[in-house]
Curated annotation (Swiss-Prot):
Function: ATPase subunit of a proteasome-like degradation complex; this subunit has chaperone activity. The binding of ATP and its subsequent hydrolysis by HslU are essential for unfolding of protein substrates subsequently hydrolyzed by HslV. HslU recognizes the N-terminal part of its protein substrates and unfolds these before they are guided to HslV for hydrolysis.
Gene: hslU
Name of the featured protein: ATP-dependent protease ATPase subunit HslU
Localization annotation: Cytoplasm
Annotated Pfam families: AAA, AAA_2
Keyword ATP-binding: yes
């Protein structure tokens, strides 16, 4: 990851509108990870990541910033809700499962990368196995005709050509494939580690078992290709890479951290609040967790926590946890202008998504600037009058706005083949204006 903070912010701007302070903070945190890896080994161990606390209302881009950041970094990433965890000793998930899930995400990520890397070799091997099934080897007999091998080779090349052109896709063959170890165990909360161990045990017991199956060539080719790719992937090497990636580049996003903060001066013991915070402390500070990859040290994993803090304040978190989240970033509520930009500027914006979806049925729609502006105003008004859910309000409004068009897209396509349906201010008002004005209706429908 050699992108500069400026380049990271530029890339985030393609997907997220506004929130420049938050983008700068995460860009610097990500760049510092690269800087740390350039240091001498003895100094590198001492440099720990500066964890981030994002504060802001729902739907302003907190989660999206973290998600896009992980894609940019090509690093193991996991998003969890703080409310899902309980204090150790109580029924529920313990916080160490966060690191176990991060390890699983890393294994999946690296396995997918390795499968892509060996794809061509796997395809060649799969092709040979399918051809072997289509053309069984002739038994050796007394006839030692020298022309036979050449004839076999010509036949094989002919079948190879037909296979690649898809002419044999529907032909049924019998082929030997690995038997899937189909053991799925569901466990009560808090017993995930034992479940993983049992699943690994049963999977190893079934390893190596093979059986003959009758399949169509197209299905068999995919199955055999995946099997050959798995065989070409070195599991030990993959685990070593995944372990290093988790420890040195892992990113954990903890959402709804405000829900485990003690609200004001409320008394009493609350299992789901202060206890969870105290369990998170060693994880964020640095400890060792047992996972599928072995022992994972959390010292250099970057933690990004976020919360709306409507009913509580960051100062309501236990002091030790506040100290472990030194970088504070406040995300601003969205304005009508922000909504307008969200609808039109980002890569794969909402209006572009709906336009392309309807185009698949031959129906063209066009969002005019005045229509987008009016839609943004209504979204802001409804958020102000009812519950402020940020940019998520746009999904609700667009679904309502285009409900009739989506339902009758096939019929409308022939009627509007020459020119598109134009979504202007009048169209938006006719479909949403009355609902937006009526507070009771907008509370339930929008």
């Amino acid at each position: 990851m050699s992108m500069t903070p400026r380049e990271i912010v530029h890339e985030l701007n393609r997907h997220i509108i506004g929130q420049d302070d938050a983008k700068r903070a995460v860009a610097i945190a990500l760049r510092n990870r690269w800087r740390r890896m350039q240091l001498p080994a003895e100094l590198r161990v001492e440099v720990t990541p500066k964890n981030i606390l994002m504060i802001g209302p729902t739907g302003v881009g907190k989660t999206e910033i973290a998600r896009r950041l992980a894609k940019l970094a090509n690093a193991p990433f996991i998003k969890v809700e703080a409310t899902k965890f309980t204090e150790v000793g109580y029924v529920g998930r313990d916080v160490e499962s966060i690191i176990r899930d991060l390890a699983d995400a890393a294994i999946k990520m690296f396995r997918e990368q390795e499968m892509i890397r060996v794809r061509h070799r796997a395809e060649d091997a799969a092709e040979e196995r399918i051809l072997d099934a289509l053309l069984p080897q002739a038994r050796t007999g007394f006839n030692s005709d020298d022309a036979a091998p050449a004839q076999d080779s010509n036949t094989r090349q002919l079948f190879r050509k037909r296979l690649r052109e898809g002419q044999l896709d529907d032909k049924e063959i019998e082929i030997e494939v690995a038997e899937a170890a189909g053991v799925d165990i569901s466990a009560p909360p808090g017993m995930e580690e034992m479940t993983n161990q049992l699943q690994s045990l049963f999977a190893n017991m079934g390893k190596g078992k093979r059986k003959n199956r009758k399949l169509k060539v197209k299905e068999a080719l995919k199955l055999v290709r995946d099997e050959e790719a798995s065989r070409l992937v070195n599991d030990e090497e993959l685990k070593a890479k995944a372990l290093e990636a988790v420890e040195q580049h892992g990113i954990v996003f903890i959402d709804e951290i405000d829900k485990v903060a003690k609200r004001g001066n409320a008394g009493g013991v609350d299992v789901s609040r202060e206890g969870v915070q105290r369990d998170l402390l060693p994880l964020i500070e640095g400890c060792t967790v047992n996972t599928k990859l072995g022992m994972v040290k959390t010292d250099h994993i970057l933690f990004i926590a976020s919360g709306a803090f409507h009913l509580s304040k960051p100062s309501d978190l236990v002091p030790e946890l506040q100290g472990r989240l030194p970088i504070r970033v406040e995300l601003k509520a969205l304005s009508p202008q922000d909504f307008e930009r969200i609808l039109s500027e980002p890569h794969a914006s909402l209006t572009e998504q709906y336009r392309e979806l309807l185009k698949t049925e031959g129906l063209n729609i066009e969002f005019l600037p005045e229509g987008i502006k009016r839609l943004a105003e209504i979204a802001w008004q409804v958020n102000e009058k009812t519950e402020n859910i940020g940019a998520r309000r746009l999904h609700t409004l667009l679904e309502r706005l285009l409900e009739e068009v989506s339902f009758s897209a096939g019929d409308l396509a022939s009627a509007h083949s020459e020119e598109p349906i134009r979504i202007d201010a009048a169209y938006v008002n006719s479909h949403l204006g009355e609902l937006a004005q009526n507070e009771d209706l907008s509370r339930y429908i929008l």
